[in-house]
């Protein structure tokens, strides 16, 4: 496939990630190409500048359209402005002020996150369906969320509205998640819920709330909230007997954990990892890993080595920054060891593995050309771990070409991903549609 950045695969993938939202209004083709032309390979500052310019232009166009009563252009402009703003801050790198302390986020990160939400909320009143802004109780916080509802003419006849709860992943925010499930679900008669959980979006940038591996605890509270919300708003006709969960990449791992909740009746897990430690150490010599974990090599040596390699690779520096920020850690060796907590493997407490808790139907996908996760060590192990899901209720989707979804998290193929997602959910919930 054509490369937008020929000698920078990380930048190329992230540019496709932005370009892929074009089908749902998150970008315009020429604007993306214009930005790409201004970015130098592996240069985060030109990346930030190029997308900031496009964001400012899109915001100005949206304001002009709003003033002239052009609803569609205003909606498109605010969506693009929000998405380009998100992209502009994507390559920010957190720093460690001293050894052992948590990383300090780039000072620009919080204002960017707030601007992304502000612009997106300007788009919400212009959407065809109703969107409710939520505050989901979690510890002493309120997780921000959106509930996207189908317009009346897109309701599924003769039944309440089925619900899809989408979990973000390692580096997304709920405004970006719009281009996955919410952009398509209401048109199919589904209500879709997104939220920023611990370690994600504004909850990370503003409050420093760290991620947790037992994501079922988070989605459990989201579902608790939905039960209360549906009871308080019976006119919405939300179907609490038809709740599904979804997510991509790390969000796919989260979706599988969420599916252990018996209130969840279907799960769509897009390109998840099976074990984060395996992912984090996949390209490191097993001999080196054994020497370190056996005590022959110190954590300090690993940290110094990673610091040296980070000077040579912006991608590695960025990856350490992202994981360290949402884990609340600064030491690369501690970050890697912390990844062991994010696993679906069997343990002494759960000999069959966490996935043995899942009994609902599951659509599981892998990415044949993933930049990060190979199919055999992650996708197929997830599939095999679903021992209590009948074979007829497990679907495996592993595309091998980019246009069919072979890039990680189905970047560049969101429309196809949604088509497969909602067809699967229709089957799970007994929804029959007439041919057109």
Swiss-Prot record:
First-level EC class: hydrolase
Lineage: superkingdom: Eukaryota
Molecular function as annotated in GO: hydrolase activity
Disulfide pairings: none
UniProt keyword list: Hydrolase
UniProt cross-references to Gene3D superfamilies, sorted A to Z: acylaminoacyl peptidase (1.20.1440.110), alpha/beta hydrolase (3.40.50.1820)
Pathway recorded for this protein: Mycotoxin biosynthesis
Enzyme Commission number: 3.7.1.-
Active site (record annotation): 249 (nucleophile)
Pfam families xref list: Abhydrolase_6 (PF12697)
Keyword Hydrolase listed: yes
UniProt entry tagged with the keyword Transport: no
InterPro entries xrefs: AB_hydrolase_1, AB_hydrolase_fold, FrsA_esterase
Stated role: Hydrolyase; part of the gene cluster that mediates the biosynthesis of a family of the mycotoxins cytochalasins E and K. The hybrid PKS-NRPS synthetase ccsA and the enoyl reductase ccsC are responsible for fusion of phenylalanine with an octaketide backbone and subsequent release of the stable tetramic acid precursor. The polyketide synthase module (PKS) of the PKS-NRPS ccsA is responsible for the synthesis of the octaketide backbone. The downstream nonribosomal peptide synthetase (NRPS) amidates the carboxyl end of the octaketide with a phenylalanine.
Family per similarity comment: Belongs to the AB hydrolase superfamily. FUS2 hydrolase family.
SUBUNIT field: Homodimer.
Protein name: Hydrolyase ccsE
Recorded name of the encoding gene: ccsE
């Amino acid at each position: 496939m054509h490369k937008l950045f020929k000698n920078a695969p990380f930048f190329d993938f992230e540019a496709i990630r932005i370009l892929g939202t074009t089908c749902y209004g998150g970008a315009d083709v020429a604007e993306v190409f214009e930005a790409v032309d201004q970015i130098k390979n592996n240069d985060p500052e030109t990346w930030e500048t190029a997308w900031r310019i496009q964001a400012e232009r899109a915001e100005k166009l949206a304001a002009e359209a709003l003033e002239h009563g052009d609803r569609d252009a205003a909606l498109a402009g605010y969506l693009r402005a929000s998405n380009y703003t998100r992209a502009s801050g994507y390559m920010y790198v957190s720093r460690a002020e001293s050894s052992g302390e948590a990383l300090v986020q780039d000072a620009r990160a919080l204002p960017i996150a707030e601007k992304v939400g502000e612009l997106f909320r300007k788009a919400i009143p212009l959407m065809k369906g109703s969107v409710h802004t939520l505050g989901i109780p979690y510890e002493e916080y309120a997780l921000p969320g959106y509930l996207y509802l189908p317009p009346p003419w897109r309701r599924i006849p003769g039944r309440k509205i089925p619900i899809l709860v989408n979990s973000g992943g390692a580096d997304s925010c709920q405004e970006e998640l719009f281009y996955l499930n919410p952009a398509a679900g209401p048109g199919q008669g589904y209500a879709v819920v997104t939220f920023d959980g611990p370690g994600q979006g504004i909850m990370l940038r503003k409050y420093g709330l760290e991620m947790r591996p037992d994501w079922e605890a988070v989605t459990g509270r989201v579902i608790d909230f939905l039960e209360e919300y549906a009871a308080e708003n019976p006119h919405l006709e939300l179907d609490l007997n038809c709740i599904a969960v979804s997510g991509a990449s790390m969000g796919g791992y989260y979706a599988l954990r969420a599916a252990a909740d018996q209130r969840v009746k279907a799960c769509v897990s897009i390109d998840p990892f099976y074990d984060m430690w395996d992912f984090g150490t996949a390209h490191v010599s097993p001999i080196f890993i054994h020497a370190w974990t056996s005590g022959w090599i110190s954590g300090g040596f690993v940290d110094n080595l990673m610091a040296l390699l980070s000077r040579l690779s912006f991608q590695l520096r960025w990856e350490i920054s992202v994981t360290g920020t949402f884990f609340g850690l600064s030491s690369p060796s501690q970050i890697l060891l912390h990844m062991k907590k994010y696993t679906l493997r069997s343990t002494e407490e759960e000999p069959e593995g966490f996935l043995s808790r899942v009994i609902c139907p599951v659509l599981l996908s892998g990415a044949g050309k993933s930049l990060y996760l190979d199919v055999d060590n992650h996708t197929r192990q997830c599939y095999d771990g679903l021992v209590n899901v009948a074979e007829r209720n497990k679907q495996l989707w592993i595309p091998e070409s980019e246009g069919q979804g072979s890039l990680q998290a189905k970047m560049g193929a969101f429309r196809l991903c949604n088509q497969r997602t909602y067809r699967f959910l229709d089957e799970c919930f007994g929804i029959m549609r007439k041919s057109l």
